[in-house]
């Protein structure tokens, strides 16, 4: 035997030391089954893929020099011969016994002993089988193909494997096709895409398995999943016990995770609650500090720590007899100090009654007042001067809120033309420049002018107007000029704006440019010649008393329900629309508004100026909203009245806001608080046709309201009217 390496050839009658050259007859993927002549010795396949050399050493199959990978060993003179190609996808795990071999196996000795055929296994389970796809296995390295390249013959391999194989042998390892040039390799993009998808599916399965159980139990859970797909008749007791064990383990795991999650949520809740309470505690401590500071300041201002001198008290009557004085003295000293102490017993009765009524209102609206106080005082705490001004601001708010206790009627008028008239809605009430006369207009197409002093002085409720004017259509709004005492403007349902002489009843101007119903008209307080009107044609028109046509027009894009000039500027105008917004314009630039106030949920029926910087708006969403002309958000919302479909009137005297309600009542608000201050219920006056109707069944509503604003600023008188035509002159007391 020479020193050259052999792939492990041998025959049945040849000793292990004899030399026989091995050859490869074909590169097919299966063993050839064609018979060979009897004289031909059995041949053993050697590895040809990639030029892999056999293991070093000499000897046959059983010797120490056998090759690393042996495809098959066949012995016997009549056995089938063949070779195993390098493209074989799987190697048999046991040598197959050849048929027709007799008496030759003894020559191989113990080294050629046959291995038993192993039972197919799948994940360690007996009697199971898994069909693994070899579509993407490289015929050279028997692993998943990496960077698939193919030869001209169409076979695909890993690029590294086929490149190394062709460097040693220029033939295809699969079909033995001659590859002339190593560069004649082409990427197989389709196979690469399929392999990528296969890897993604495998990763998804592994991800689910890794996250469903721990790494130690992953194999057992894989067994459990396989058992679930097994027929129940094939399950034995061991399998059932395994499944129960895994389920109990999973149950305990889920219970532990659920309990941990509950504890985590509880911990988060407790921490958030603790943080909120700490913040509340800090806020309360700040508020207490402010309260203590203000209490000391008020005590110093009221002089409670200084003794009350005799000169500072109300002069007393002559002292009674000693017997009586002793009783009085003992009574006085037994009373606690404060509002009900001795110093208060010396006050006038009106003081005590006023204080009692204010206390009553303070108790009824304590929460609102408390909120108002802290919003005023906690807004910005700085120096002593700022603190004093904030306290004075709240003191003024508290004083105005508790000033009035009730609403008292002074006089009653009627706008109805006759007893059988079913509709006598008063749509507008306005005072003239000096508040000496007031005009009433409505759906009866009449404007009635009354003298305020005469109405108040008459002992009876039958009052006749000083003048009466008749229009061609229902009247929606009227407005007095702030400069000309007799000049009155009206708007009606035909879209006409008319200028009247309020005392003679003569028409001076008629404007007919609106295409639809005109809802509102208003004179400019700073420019006596300028007035504005708003209509359902989505236009606000500006008029001059000297001209016959409009001087400007603003496109509102929605029905205009109300229009009002600023009381402190000749250029600024506000109007409410059916688009739920209040639009604020500068007349020097009518192309776009200065501000659009959004917040109402329905159409804005009224917009009135509380001051030069504040606007109050009413809507059919049953809310009033207070706005600042320089801020887009709502300052305060007023709720309590009912307004869902009608024009119920809106007016303000600077501090108090009055509006009607669809429950036939008048509501009053203070601009600093959101809740209702006072209410006044109109009596239901039944006509002859409605005498059998119950009071709760009526659909009457307060339709108009107006304050009597005097030049000195005192304004506690207002006039309100309802849909029955009843007009009430009311006073706040």
Curated annotation (Swiss-Prot):
Regulation: TRIB1 competes with substrates for RFWD2 binding.
Region (Disordered): 1-43, 307-327
PROSITE patterns: WD_REPEATS_1, WD_REPEATS_2, WD_REPEATS_REGION, ZF_RING_1, ZF_RING_2
Protein EC: 2.3.2.27
UniProt-annotated location(s): Nucleus speckle; Cytoplasm
GO terms under biological process: positive regulation of proteasomal ubiquitin-dependent protein catabolic process; proteasome-mediated ubiquitin-dependent protein catabolic process; protein ubiquitination; response to ionizing radiation
Region (Interaction with TRIB1): 645-647
Pathway per the UniProt entry: Protein modification; protein ubiquitination
Matching InterPro entries: COP1 (IPR042755), WD40/YVTN_repeat-like_dom_sf (IPR015943), WD40_repeat_CS (IPR019775), WD40_repeat_dom_sf (IPR036322), WD40_rpt (IPR001680), Znf_RING (IPR001841), Znf_RING/FYVE/PHD (IPR013083), Znf_RING_CS (IPR017907)
Keyword Coiled coil: yes
A single Gene Ontology CC term: nuclear speck
Each WD repeat, start to end: 421-460, 470-510, 513-553, 555-595, 599-637, 640-679, 695-731
Entry annotated with the keyword Metal-binding: yes
Zinc finger (RING-type): 138-176
Reaction equations catalysed: S-ubiquitinyl-[E2 ubiquitin-conjugating enzyme]-L-cysteine + [acceptor protein]-L-lysine = [E2 ubiquitin-conjugating enzyme]-L-cysteine + N(6)-ubiquitinyl-[acceptor protein]-L-lysine
Chain positions of motif Nuclear localization signal 2: 197-208
Placement of sequence motif Nuclear localization signal 1: 111-115
Keywords for the protein's UniProt record, in alphabetical order: Coiled coil, Cytoplasm, Metal-binding, Nucleus, Repeat, Transferase, Ubl conjugation pathway, WD repeat, Zinc, Zinc-finger
MF terms (GO), sorted A to Z: ubiquitin protein ligase activity; zinc ion binding
PANTHER family associated with the record: E3 UBIQUITIN-PROTEIN LIGASE COP1
Family, per entry: Belongs to the COP1 family.
Name recorded for this polypeptide: E3 ubiquitin-protein ligase COP1
Gene name tied to this protein: Cop1
């Amino acid at each position: 035997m020479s020193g050259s390496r052999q792939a492990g050839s041998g025959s049945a009658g040849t000793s292990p030391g004899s030399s026989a050259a091995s050859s490869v007859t074909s590169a097919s993927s299966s063993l050839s089954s064609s018979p060979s002549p009897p004289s031909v010795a059995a041949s053993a396949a050697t590895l040809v893929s990639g030029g892999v050399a056999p293991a070093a050493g000499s000897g046959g199959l059983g010797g120490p020099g056998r090759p690393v990978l042996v495809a098959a060993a066949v012995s016997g003179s009549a056995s089938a011969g063949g070779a195993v190609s390098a493209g074989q996808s799987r190697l048999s795990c046991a040598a197959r016994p050849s048929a027709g071999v007799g008496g030759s196996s003894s020559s191989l000795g113990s080294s050629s002993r046959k291995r038993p055929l192993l039972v197919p296994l799948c994940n360690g389970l007996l009697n199971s089988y898994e069909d693994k796809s070899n579509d993407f296995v490289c015929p050279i390295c028997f692993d998943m193909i990496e960077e698939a390249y193919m030869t001209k013959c169409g076979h695909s391999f890993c690029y590294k494997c086929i490149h190394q194989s062709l460097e040693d042998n220029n033939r295809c390892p699969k079909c033995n096709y001659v590859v002339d040039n190593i560069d004649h390799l082409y990427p197989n993009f389709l196979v690469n895409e399929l392999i990528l998808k296969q890897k993604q599916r495998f990763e998804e399965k592994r991800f689910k398995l890794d996250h469903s159980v721990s790494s130690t139990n992953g194999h057992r859970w894989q067994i459990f999943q396989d058992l679930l797909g097994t027929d129940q008749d094939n399950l034995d007791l061991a399998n059932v016990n395994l499944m129960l064990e895994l389920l109990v383990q999973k149950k305990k795991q889920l219970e532990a995770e659920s309990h941990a999650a509950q504890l985590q949520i509880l911990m988060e809740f407790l921490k958030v609650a603790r943080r909120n309470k700490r913040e509340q505690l800090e806020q309360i401590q700040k508020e207490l500090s402010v309260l203590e500071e203000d209490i000391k300041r008020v005590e110093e201002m009221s002089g409670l720590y200084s003794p009350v001198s005799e000169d500072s008290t109300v002069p007393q009557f002559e002292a009674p007899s000693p017997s009586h004085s002793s009783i009085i003295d003992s009574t006085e000293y037994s009373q606690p100090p404060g509002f009900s102490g001795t110093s208060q017993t010396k006050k006038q009765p009106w003081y005590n009654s006023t204080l009692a009524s204010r206390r009553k209102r303070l108790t009824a609206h304590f929460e609102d007042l408390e909120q108002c106080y802290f919003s005023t005082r906690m807004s910005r705490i700085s120096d002593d001067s700022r603190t004093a001004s904030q306290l004075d601001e709240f003191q003024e708010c508290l004083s105005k809120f508790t000033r009035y206790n009730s609403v008292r009627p002074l006089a009653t008028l009627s706008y109805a033309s006759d007893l059988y008239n079913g509709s006598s809605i008063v749509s507008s009430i306005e005072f003239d420049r000096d508040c000496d006369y007031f005009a009433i207009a409505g759906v009866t197409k009449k404007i009635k002018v009354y003298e305020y002093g005469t109405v108040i002085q008459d002992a009876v409720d039958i009052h006749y107007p000083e003048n009466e004017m008749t229009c061609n259509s229902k009247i929606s709004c009227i407005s007095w000029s702030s400069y000309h005492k007799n000049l009155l403007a009206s708007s009606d349902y035909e879209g006409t704006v008319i200028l009247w002489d309020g005392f003679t009843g003569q028409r001076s101007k008629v404007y007919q440019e609106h295409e639809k119903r005109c809802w509102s008209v208003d004179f400019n307080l700073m420019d006596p010649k300028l007035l504005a009107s708003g209509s359902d044609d989505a236009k606000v028109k500006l008029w001059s008393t000297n001209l016959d046509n409009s001087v400007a027009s603003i496109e509102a894009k929605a029905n205009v329900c109300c229009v009002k000039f600023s009381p402190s500027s000749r250029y600024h105008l506000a109007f409410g629309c059916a688009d739920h917004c209040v639009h604020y314009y500068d007349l020097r630039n009518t192309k776009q508004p200065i501000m659009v106030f959004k917040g109402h949920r329905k159409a804005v029926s009224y917009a009135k100026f509380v001051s030069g910087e504040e606007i109050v708006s009413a809507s059919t969403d049953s809310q009033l909203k207070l706005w600042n002309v320089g801020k887009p958000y709502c300052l305060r919302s007023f709720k309590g009245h009912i307004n869902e479909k009608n024009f119920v009137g809106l007016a303000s005297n600077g501090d108090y806001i009055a509006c009607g309600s669809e429950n036939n009542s008048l509501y009053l608000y203070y601009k600093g608080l959101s809740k209702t201050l006072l209410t006044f219920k109109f009596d239901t006056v039944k006509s002859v046709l409605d005498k059998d109707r119950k009071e709760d069944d009526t659909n009457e509503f307060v339709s108009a309201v107006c304050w009597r604003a005097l030049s000195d600023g005192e304004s506690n008188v207002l006039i309100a009217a309802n849909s029955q035509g009843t007009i009430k002159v009311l006073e706040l007391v």
